[in-house]
């Protein structure tokens, strides 16, 4: 996929032209930011704790779909997790990529940090991204997340890297507000720099050296506590027009149908009081009201669903006049059908004759596949 005119790199393989790119807008992406467009933002992909045995398939799928355009950096404990990157795209304690314009890259965690050491791993990753990659913004997700990088670029158009930023899908944990790691969250350069400074100072709120097992599995909660109590940086309402969510912790089919877990719904109750937003945040809309046109992420998206969602969006961007019948037929042809391929946390497409279920799904699919929301950065 093309990541912008004149950017200089060819990636791991010859990139496919991305139909949703700024070329449709006639934009010159080279002048969109005073720095190299390669450094405007990165997407950092941490290991998902769900269905770890299929991780390599998910990484391969991300590489073949949205990963290169998102400037994906895979966090790995061993280079064998994604051997395609090889040495030329390796970020580690002792090396940087020979070709900084090649994506995905891999960020190799040192052997002193184990697979279950979530806290030191997240700290190491944020530090390494800040010190060795130094993007304006970094979007932190895991390998079950599906990202629409052009929409992330659109969202960041009016944001500034030297201002604090902790943006994602805000939810509550008792009386604290945090951003879902599943839906992903964006940190600005200033915020990453401030976190690293607090770790270097061994601030007791920010640097938990012996965190409990539960916190090792949820390290973002410690980051949130540091951001709020020490740096005074809080999660914010990132919905479009204060109504439509951009970052989603469930896949498209479950978000549209409203078939999300009860725990997820409860984490939105009374959010208007905790985050000083309006009461509409307390309830998750389903159907056509579920998703912003510039939706940035979905979660629990398996490797086959990732390919299906990517190819469907590409087809709609290329041919926005596709009929509903054609779009429905395309989705049925592309989407995984067997439970083992869909995954336990996702859902398949509606039954073919279920008009009431298909209508909102087709509407949302069109909404998130508009040429008008595609940006490069």
Model segments located where?
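Short beta-strand/loop segment that forms part of the nucleotide-sugar
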Residues: 71-81
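C-terminal catalytic/acceptor-binding lobe
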Residues: 15, 214-377
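Conserved catalytic core of nucleotide-sugar-dependent glycosyltransferases
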Residues: 137, 141, 145-252, 257-258
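Alpha-helical interaction elements in eukaryotic regulators
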Residues: 54-58, 114, 118-122, 148-152, ...
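N-proximal low-complexity "stem/linker" segments adjacent to membrane-targeting elements
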Residues: 2-20, 24-54
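Short, acidic, metal-binding catalytic loop of nucleotide-sugar glycosyltransferases
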Residues: 61-71
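Active-site-proximal specificity loops/subdomain of glycosyltransferases
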Residues: 79-135
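Short coil/turn segments at secondary-structure boundaries
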Residues: 58-63, 86-91, 99-103, 120-123, ...
């Amino acid at each position: 996929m093309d990541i912008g005119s004149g950017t200089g790199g060819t990636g791991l393989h010859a990139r496919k032209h991305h139909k949703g790119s700024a070329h449709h807008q006639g934009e010159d992406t080279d002048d969109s930011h005073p720095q190299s467009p390669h450094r405007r933002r990165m997407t950092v992909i941490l290991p998902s704790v769900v269905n770890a045995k299929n991780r390599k398939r998910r990484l391969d799928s991300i590489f073949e779909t949205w990963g290169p355009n998102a400037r994906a950096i895979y966090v790995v404990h061993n280079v064998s997790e994604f051997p395609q990157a090889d040495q030329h795209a390796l970020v580690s304690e002792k090396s940087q990529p020979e070709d900084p314009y090649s994506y995905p890259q891999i960020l190799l965690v040192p052997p002193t940090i184990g697979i279950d050491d979530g806290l030191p791993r997240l700290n190491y990753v944020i530090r390494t991204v800040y010190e060795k990659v130094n993007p304006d913004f970094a979007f932190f997700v895991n390998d079950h997340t599906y990202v629409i990088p052009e929409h992330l670029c659109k969202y960041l158009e009016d944001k500034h890297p030297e201002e604090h930023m902790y943006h994602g899908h805000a939810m509550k944990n008792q009386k604290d507000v945090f951003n879902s790691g599943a839906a992903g969250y964006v940190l600005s350069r200033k915020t990453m720099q401030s976190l690293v400074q607090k770790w270097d100072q061994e601030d007791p709120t920010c640097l938990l050296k012996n965190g409990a097992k539960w916190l090792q599995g949820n390290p973002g909660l410690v980051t949130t506590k540091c951001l709020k109590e020490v740096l005074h940086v809080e999660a914010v309402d990132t919905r479009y027009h204060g109504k439509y969510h951009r970052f989603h912790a469930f896949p498209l089919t479950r978000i549209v149908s409203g078939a999300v877990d009860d725990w997820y719904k409860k984490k939105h109750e009374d959010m208007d009081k905790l985050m000083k937003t309006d009461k509409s945040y307390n309830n998750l809309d389903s159907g056509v009201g579920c998703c912003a046109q510039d939706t940035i992420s979905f979660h629990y998206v398996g490797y086959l669903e990732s390919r299906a969602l990517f190819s469907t969006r590409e087809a709609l961007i290329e041919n926005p006049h596709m009929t509903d019948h054609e779009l429905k037929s395309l989705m049925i042809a592309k989407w995984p059908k067997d439970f083992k391929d869909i995954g336990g946390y996702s859902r398949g497409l509606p039954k073919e004759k279920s008009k009431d279920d298909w209508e909102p799904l087709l509407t949302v699919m069109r909404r998130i596949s508009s040429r008008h929301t595609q940006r490069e950065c």
